[in-house]
């Protein structure tokens, strides 16, 4: 028995390796998607709401950016939920 109570001689099963690999892929995908979301929000909301950048935001610009970000986040969440739901259905159909 190993130091922490497990069998130190047992290598992870192929299912364990697959599970670990899939978890890593999901995490990397989530990070990439978050980066893409932030990039799109910056690109589109900034261009739309701040046509002439200055040293400070005026209240209208702040409000516009805030609303734009909320819309992007809402749309992103809807698309993500729909995609996940579809992937889960397809996974069930394969099994």
From Swiss-Prot:
Keyword Nucleotidyltransferase: no
Lineage: superkingdom: Eukaryota
Main location: mitochondrion
SUPFAM superfamilies per UniProt: Tim10-like
SS bond list: 45-68, 49-64
Pfam families: zf-Tim10_DDP
One CC-aspect GO term: mitochondrial inner membrane
Entries under InterPro entries matching the protein: Tim10-like, Tim10-like_dom_sf
Subcellular location: Mitochondrion inner membrane
GO MF annotations in UniProt: metal ion binding
Chain positions of motif Twin CX3C motif: 45-68
UniProt xrefs under Gene3D superfamilies: Mitochondrial import inner membrane translocase subunit tim13 like domains
Membrane disposition: Peripheral membrane protein
Entry keyword set: Chaperone, Disulfide bond, Membrane, Metal-binding, Mitochondrion, Mitochondrion inner membrane, Protein transport, Translocation, Transport, Zinc
GO biological process, one term: protein insertion into mitochondrial inner membrane
Record note on quaternary structure: Heterohexamer; composed of 3 copies of TIM8 and 3 copies of TIM13, named soluble 70 kDa complex. Associates with the TIM22 complex, whose core is composed of TIM22 and TIM54. Interacts with the transmembrane regions of multi-pass transmembrane proteins in transit.
Family indicated by similarity: Belongs to the small Tim family.
Free-text domain note: The twin CX3C motif contains 4 conserved Cys residues that form 2 disulfide bonds in the mitochondrial intermembrane space. However, during the transit of TIM13 from cytoplasm into mitochondrion, the Cys residues probably coordinate zinc, thereby preventing folding and allowing its transfer across mitochondrial outer membrane.
Protein's name according to its UniProt entry: Mitochondrial import inner membrane translocase subunit tim13
Protein species of origin: Schizosaccharomyces pombe (strain 972 / ATCC 24843)
Species lineage: Eukaryota, Fungi, Dikarya, Ascomycota, Taphrinomycotina
């Amino acid at each position: 028995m190993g130091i922490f109570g497990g069998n130190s001689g047992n290598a992870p099963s192929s299912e364990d390796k697959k599970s670990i690999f899939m978890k890593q892929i999901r995490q990397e995908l989530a990070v990439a998607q978050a980066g893409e979301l932030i990039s799109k929000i910056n690109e589109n909301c900034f261009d739309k709401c701040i046509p002439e950048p200055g040293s400070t935001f005026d209240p209208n610009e702040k409000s516009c950016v805030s609303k734009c970000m909320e819309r992007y986040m809402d749309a992103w969440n809807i698309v993500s939920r729909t995609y996940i739901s579809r992937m889960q259905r397809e996974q069930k159909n394969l099994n």
